[in-house]
């Protein structure tokens, strides 16, 4: 599964494995148990996308169980 890209610092969850989805020198920090990953420092740059927006799946609401 591929999560949506990070935009502003600390705003969106992101996938930290593989290529750096945060971009522009920003880093992704892993949250607890693989959840709540965040990009830090400024705005991230979107990862190159294919033609289908459907390739990027939004994180389901139930991923926010704390």
UniProtKB/Swiss-Prot annotation:
Region annotated Interaction with thrombin active site sits at 1-3
Provide one Gene Ontology cellular component.
extracellular region
What one GO molecular function would you report for this record?
serine-type endopeptidase inhibitor activity
Matching entries from SUPFAM superfamilies are given as: Leech antihemostatic proteins
UniProt keyword Acyltransferase, yes or no = no
Gene3D superfamilies documented for this protein: Thrombin Inhibitor (Hirudin), subunit I
Record keywords: Glycoprotein included? yes
Listed as disulfide-bonded, the cysteine pairs are 6-14, 16-28, 22-39
Mind telling me what this protein is named? Answer: Hirudin-PA
Record's InterPro entries?
Hirudin (IPR024793), Hirudin/antistatin (IPR011061), Prot_inh_hirudin (IPR000429)
């Amino acid at each position: 599964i591929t999560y949506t890209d990070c935009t502003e610092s600390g705003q969106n969850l992101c996938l930290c494995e593989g290529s750096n989805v945060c971009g522009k020198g920003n880093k992704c920090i892993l949250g607890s148990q693989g959840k709540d990953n965040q990009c830090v420092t400024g705005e991230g740059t979107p990862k190159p996308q294919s033609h289908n927006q459907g390739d990027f799946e939004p994180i389901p609401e139930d991923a926010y169980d704390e």
